[in-house]
Amino acid sequence: MSSSNALDALIQALRRLPGVGVKSAQRMAFHLLQHDRAGGQALAQALHDALGSVQHCARCHTFTEAETCRTCLDPGRDATRLCVVETPADQAALERTGAFKGLYFVLMGRLSPLDGVGPKEIGLQKLIARATEGGVQEVILATNFHAEGEATAHVISQALKRQGLHVTRLARGVPVGSELEYVDLGTIAHALVDRR
């Protein structure tokens, strides 16, 4: 605790960010106050603006300032392919590859019964409605490869297949440029089973 209530409040606010503990929050707060007050003002203004204007896209659920995001409005996208991701960060990672030219649906999470996150909370019914509104020929599940991501993919796959949709899952395997001796056994096992 410092001698300033405002400084303590700033440190506590910074601790709300993922991966930021007390020491990191203190370093950030001290840096902004001591060396970069203009940067602190810019950060505060950008945060204020984003909180006031960023919302969910009506079609894909990602973040946007408009009712419908630029990706969903882009006539150059392949509307026959719909890729389901957990977060906008996952969507951004796929976009950076330049390999996917279809559309997205962002779950804004993954199934986690222990945390009270079920099919309703990840928008399963919205996804089903989006995938069945016409034109979608393939739904690609790009949830993360851990227990919750796999469970999420399974539940979504079953629900979409009941609607008669073609559902695929991202392949998993050995990373490009890696050496087998350094790859974990689970990855090697999946690569062997899913070989083509």
Curated annotation (Swiss-Prot):
Residues 80-175 form the Toprim domain. GO terms for molecular function: DNA binding; zinc ion binding. SMART domains: TOPRIM. CDD domains: TOPRIM_recR (cd01025). A zinc finger (C4-type) spans 57-72. GO terms for biological process: DNA recombination; DNA repair. Belongs to the RecR family. May play a role in DNA repair. It seems to be involved in an RecBC-independent recombinational process of DNA repair. It may act with RecF and RecO. PANTHER family: RECOMBINATION PROTEIN RECR. This is Recombination protein RecR. It comes from Verminephrobacter eiseniae (strain EF01-2). The gene is recR.
